Every structure is written in structure tokens, then in C-alpha cells.
Amino acid sequence: MRHRILFFFLAFIGISQFVTSSDVRNKYNFNSDWLLNVGDVPEAKQPRFSDSEWKKVTLPHAFNEDEAFRLSIDELTDTIMWYRKHFRLPADSKNKKVFVEFEGVRQGADFYINGQNVGLHENGVMAVGFDLTPYIKYGQENVIAVRIDNDWNYKERATGTKYQWSNKNFNANYGGIPKNVWLHVTDRLYQTLPLYSNLKTTGVYIYAEDIRVKSRKAIIHAESEIRNEYNRDKQVSYQVELIDRDGTSIQTFEGTKAVVKPGETITLKAASEVDNLHFWSWGYGYLYTVKTSLWVDGRKVDEVATRTGFRKTRFGKGMIWLNDRVIQMKGFAQRTSNEWPGVGMSVPAWLSDYSNHLMVEGNANLVRWMHVTPWKQDIESCDRVGLIQAMQAGDAEKDCEGRQWEQRTELMRDAIIYNRNNPSIIFYECGNESISREHMIEMKAIRDLYDPHGGRAIGSREMLDIREAEYGGEMLYINKSAHHPMWAMEYCRDEGLRKYWDDYSYPYHKDGDGSNSYKSTVTNKVQKKVDARVYNRNQDSFTIENIIRWFDYWRERPGTGDRVSSGGVKIIFSDTNTHYRGVENYRRSGVTDAMRIPKDPFFAHQVMWDGWVDTECPRIYIVGHWNYNDTVVKPVYVVSSADKVELFLNGKSLGNGERDYHFLYTFKDIAFVPGKLEAVGYDENGKECCRTQLQTAGKPEQIQLSFIQSPEGWKADGADMVLLQVEVMDKDGNRCPLANDLIHFEVEGPAEWRGGIAQGENNYILSKDLPVECGINRALIRSLTTAGNVRITAKADGLKSAEISLTSSPVEVKNGLSSYIPGDELEGRLTRGETPQTPSYKVSKVDVGIVSAIAGANNENTVNSFDDNELSEWRNDGKAATAWITYKLERAARVDEVCMKLTGWRMRSYPLEIYAGKELIWSGDTDKSLGYVHLDVKPVLTNEITIRLKGTSKGGDAFGQIVEVAAPVANELDLFKAKDGDKTGHELRIVEIEFKENLLK
């Protein structure tokens, strides 16, 4: 098959002479009327097989959804199951092309149509498509059957190779068809689908170039791969229409005509400059619809509508620009399953929006989907809510070779083709561990081939010394760079149950109490933990830890020197049915629980992250609640970006808080008195800039119910859901923060109770008896395929009961097909507004450059301590007399601060003296850290600074529970696993050093 490329550029609007035709493609919702059987039934591929006893389901639907959060990840059932569906095509589909698109199956699947095998798909992650045209029976019933095996140890049939990402740590095994399925009916001259898996086609590619943000202009490009499956030549014209979010057509332009031979595949292109554009941005999900159409003899024969957005990016100098404004990455490393109790990952599109927009509400700007490619539904959701994404392909905790590496490159290729029109994807990630330079170059070539104009950086975790990477960053440590940006990929692994406020509150869980052992999903054995505290925190200490850990990255933000941190993502947003170390059988590192009820750290991040780099909107939050016994005297913690915070109790000032880590204010020994606790923040001029309060609630009196649902209403398609929120309130309608009452629910009408989660037997999964925790809980309720009114009643001992009703609306399904496309009517959210045109940060520090250095030993390696490479170091020879190094500066300066990354940063405290010329400007022991130490020195005019070890450094790990899943290796510069890494003698070892002048004295 030949492949040609035709291109035509129009700088102005094209004037179309075409006549609109209705003879265009149809996209059908193919989720309805599926039948499910758990177990291998080989005869099920035959169309006449009797499936009348099989379970009726609406997709997306994992066969083991009931196990989500009831079982730990490694216990999720893996087996063989079959899905079948009976359907008929409309009469006008005859002589057309018919394709089926599965957004994903888990893990390996054989596909049959009317008894004929049409293909195999095995990676368990990506979408796959099949051409059903040769097998379709027009005017008759058709049967599609899918045999799926979700074995944890599934191996590729042709090679016997296991997929690296089929992993019991991070990739929750919700087996079957947990994603959407679509049916496409097109003309025989058509634009292909972006389904390289099996179909080997690339579809439509939309992108912008020459973006001028201030003048709102760009050149919009469209490219469509088209194929002619007629038995004669076709002369084709190509047209592009750009439609804004209000449905207004703002520009139409055309490409050249082309003659496409039978069986030929070509690519048509067109481009035009467009004015008055709205650029997609953080918290500004402005999307356009781009309609690309094919015309023959003045008749439209095919049209594809692509929903996309346009934005400008740049990566360099250790920083990231979005629409010409520097942005520091602040967000979450979320499990790609993004799962919920009782249903797993298979939720409606509006609920994906609810969850993902909650990140934006918390002022996150980035979600890093972990280890495998995210579901298309989540990708499109992030487009709508304005949340930047890092898109993985597939991996585990290490680089690999041979067929496993080929599996990774193939998945990256397919994922890029499928998702390259989604503006929220700004990063392509090639691995959850460093990959080789050769592998990085190979992945980069894939990006350059299939998405050369998308404005996306491609990189991998680590990549500290591989300049071909366009971004990188470690998992737990602080990295800085003056070349490609570095952001931390999974910081702060601590866990805390939402139920536990603090030591002083019911149920009086002591901070850190929990088992000192857990079942490792790596070894499948029970392992001892030296210290369980960080995995069983109360909410107050969990919040403080999150503040401390973010401060490490904020301190190195753009504007603080030449080498900066581009931020980081905290590991997981919502509690997850994956690898855990705490008491419960699921991970509780989220800033929300699994039902997306915020914990205190959610609001702490909302305070700290409200700005592109520097804080732009002062905020304040009091950690915890204000309902205690009269004898309680406790610290009160306030999170604020204000310069000073004052606390008031019932109008009386309790003074100003003690400030730590820039954002944390502590008020010690506050005696509880019922009433109103207020915190007021002041700016540097003493003017009030933010205020918040807590109010003591009365005794529990009543239950309150409310719904959270789609803006489209509740659809009776068997897949749509609503969130039922239940709260225990006092007589005045205030939530009771210590209520943990068991609520008994009754459901009447066409609905299925999927429930919520709470601490207790089986985590209360699917139970209609569900306790509130801290006065609140939520439950999922799924529609049936019958519409009607649903009434829910909630009762509890000693509380006034409540009831609430909701009516589901019918969804038309005819012969297994529906024109209702969930998510199509969901609008982009514009909550943060367009990208500001003001600078995102003030320059607070400038570096004084280093010209050269001499040392007591290893002079040839002194440059390693200022080479912008955190995998190199200078070290002396271990003798006291050689434990010094002198740096010559590019100019005489009054240095205010010395910033260093010292080898063994988490293990060692170095006793140092620092001299400006011969004058001592600092003496002391450096702190242990997760990266850099900052030493405020006496500012003395000099062009020469000496660092000298003044004694034996002190060893011992200060961060023993901050560890990865995979074991670190002994030769890493943190010395965490090095033999005698904490025994340093007279070693002086420097990874990077910087000398800074403070401009904000």
C-alpha cells in the first residue's frame, strides 16, 4: 500500500463551495447490552451459543469490580472470562466500513465476530481497533465475543514474555472490559482511526504553530490519514472547520484536492492562521472542536470531529513555560486506575471530571499517571478541567532489554498516536526509573515521528545526566537543574487514615500506632517495618509532613538562582487499592480518601500551591476541628501563605504563631473553650489578607443527605452513577466532626447500591450499613437500564432519619447501539481564567558563578561539584589534611548563602567551616536532608570561598521510612545502601555547590 503526503497552506479563510451531506460517519456508544460469564467457555465464540444465563452488564465493567478496596491489590482475582454482545446495524450501513474501538481490556484478549477470530490484543493498557466489515451480517443479528485472561503473570503468546507493567504493586487488576467501547461506521473513503494496535492507522493530527499568546494568534494545522477502499480512483477535497466552545464556527479552510487510488492511504494537510484564540491553560479547559471532512463531487463523504485545545510550551533553563509564563509543577502522582470502592476504575465521565477537577480546586496543576497509559476518559477529563498530564506508556521499576523493551516502545507509539490531540498532555514519560541514553534517544525518535509539533517534552524518571531527555527528576529527592527541568515524581509516601484527626479526638488513635509488619507485594511475604509511625499517621501530623516535604521544592523554585527545581508531584491524590504499608489493606497516602472526601492535607496544599510559582493568592487554613473535651490543651496548627498569622478564640487574641517551613504556624498549648476559633493572616505591611474559622458543633441530632451528580442529570444506561453524601449534623445544621455513627440505608427504585468505604470488616465494601467518619461519608449508586424515581432512606440510632429522591432519565438503545456519548456534553471548566500576562515569580536570589576550584585532593574532579550534574561529585581522599576545596568566583561579591548537595545527604551531617578569603563566615554541622542544605553566611566581599571539614562527620539515616518500593543500589550518592555509608571519617564529598546573593534582604 502506497502512502503519500499532500499539503496546502492557507494564510486566510478558505471559501467553501461544498454542499453539506448527511452521508457521513456514525459513532455509536457500544457499551450497552453486554453479557458476562466468569470462566473459560471456548464455545462462547460461536454466534449460536446460548448465553441467556449470563450476567447482563453495561460497559465499562470489570468482572471483579466487587473486590475493589475489599481485597488488597495482590489478592484481586485473575482468571478467564467472556463478554458477548448481540447487535444489528442500521439498514443504511450496508456497503460501509465498520470498525470497533475498545479503549482497553485487561489483560490479553481474543476477539470474535460471528464466530470469526478478528485479532488478539495483549498489553492490557492501550486501545485497540478491529475492522469488522468483512464479517458483518447486514439486516441480521451479529454477535461479538471477547475472551479475556487477566492472569497477573500473563505472557505474550508469541514470545512468552511477561509485560513489565502487569505488577502487583501499582497496576490494580480490574479484569475484563473496564473501559468504553465504540462502533464506527464510515464511508469506504474515510479518515482512519488513531488505533495503531492492529489497524496500523494514525487518524487525525491537530496542532498549532507560530503561537503568539499576547496577540491571540496561531497557525492551526490539521492532518488526516485517509484511505480509499473503493475499487476506483477518488478525487478528494479536504476541509477543516474550527468551532469554539459555544458552538460558533469561527473559521473554515481547505487543503488541495487529491486523487486517491484504490487501496491507497495518503495524508492530507491544511493550515490557516486564526485570530482571537483562547489558549488552553492550567484551570482553563478551553477546547475547540475541529471538524475535518472529505468531499467527493461536492458531497461530504466523511467527517471527524476532534475536540482539542491550543497552548504554547517551552522547556529549558531548568524551567517550564506554559503560554509564555513560567510554571512550577505542583500536583500528584496518581495511580492510573484512579479507582473507586466497589467499582474499580469504571466510572462515568462526569465522575472523572469531579475527581480530576478536585485536584485543580486544590491548586494542583499536574497529574502524573503512574506506570501505565491513562484511560482515554481521564485524559479527556483533564483537557476539560485544565489539568496538565504526564502520560506514561508502560513500565515497572527499572529499565529493560529485548522483547520487554520493545513492548514498551510499541506501547509508547500507540499511546502517542491515540492521545496526541489532547492539550493537557505536556509530558511523555518513558519510565518509572532511569533508562539508558540509547533508550531515551529511541523513545524521542518515536515522539518526533508521531507527534513532532505537539509541544510535549519527553523524558523519564531520573535522567539527571542524560541531556537527550527533555525533563527528569528523582522519586523522593530534590533535584535542581539549569538545563532540562527536573521535578520530583513521587514525593511524600506517608499514610494517614481520614478517620483519625489527632491524639485528642475520638477514636483516640495515637499518632503512628499500627502494625510493625506488612505483606510485601514484591516478595509476597510478611516483612517487618522498623518504624510504623509514618504509615499510620493522624491527620495533624500527616498535614505537617506534607508541608515540610513541599517546602523542600518551594525553596528551590524558579527565581532562586540559575539551578532550580521545577517542583514535584506528591504520591497519590486519593487513597488507592494498590501497594500499601499501613494497617489497612489499601494505600492511604491520598490527600482525599477513596470517595474523594478531602483530608486536611488537601487544604494545606490548596494554601501552598495557589500560584504558578510564587504565591499569588494568600490563603489560610486551620488544621483539624474545634470539638474537644474541656480538659484538652493542645497545639493548634495553621497553614498559611501570609507573612504573619494571629489566632483568636471567641474574639480574644491568642497571639501570633511560630512560623516554620514558610507555611506552617504553630500555636502551642491552646486550652479548648467551645466557640469560634479564628485565624487571621497579615501581609508584610501588617494588612489583613486572609481569614478562616472553626466553630464548635453541638451534639449530633440529625442525618443530612445530598447528591453529587452529572450536570447532564442521571442517565439510566446501567453505567451512570451518583454520589450520595451523608453527614451527621447538630440541630443548627453544623457537621459534627467527631460523629462516627453507623448509618443504615434503604434503596427503593431502579438503582444498584455500590456503596462506600470505612474502617471495619471488609472495609464496608458494598454494605448498606456504612458509618460516617468525622461526620461524613459517601456512597456510589449506579443506575439500571430502566429509568425511574429512586428513593434513599438513611437511619441511625439516636439520630433523626433522612430521605432523598432522584429520577434517572432514559437512554435510547436500539439493537445494541446508542447515539448517547457520555462526556460529549461536558463542558471545559474555566475556573482559573486565562494565563496571566504578569511574571509568575520575583527573582529573590542570584548565583555568583564559579570560574574554577582547587582542592586538597583530586583536583581533576573539582569541576564535578559545579557541573550541573547530580550524578557526579568531588571528594577528597579521606584524610583530614585534604578535606578542603577553594572556589574562585566570577566576580567579587557579598555572598549571603551557600547552597550544597553533599554526598550522603540523608545519612551524613558534615562539620564545616566556610571562609571568604581568610575570614570565617560560617561554622557548624550541616543538616541531613533529602537534597540540598542552605547555609546563611556572613556577607563579606570576596571572590574566593573555601569549604573545609573541621572534624569527623556524624552519620545515621534521618529519613529511614522514606523509601521506594524497589530496593536502591549501593553505588548511589545518597549512600542509603552503601556499606558503612554513615561512617565517614574525614571524607568531604560535594555533589553540587552554589553561592547566592539574596536580593530580598
Task: Give the ranges of each region predicted by the language model.
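Substrate-binding/catalytic cleft of secreted carbohydrate-active enzymes
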Residues: 298, 353-359, 365-601, 605-608, ...
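Beta-strand-rich structural segments
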Residues: 222-226, 293, 636-639, 680, ...
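Active-site-adjacent substrate/metal-binding segments within catalytic domains
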Residues: 61-89, 93-102, 106-114, 119-122, ...
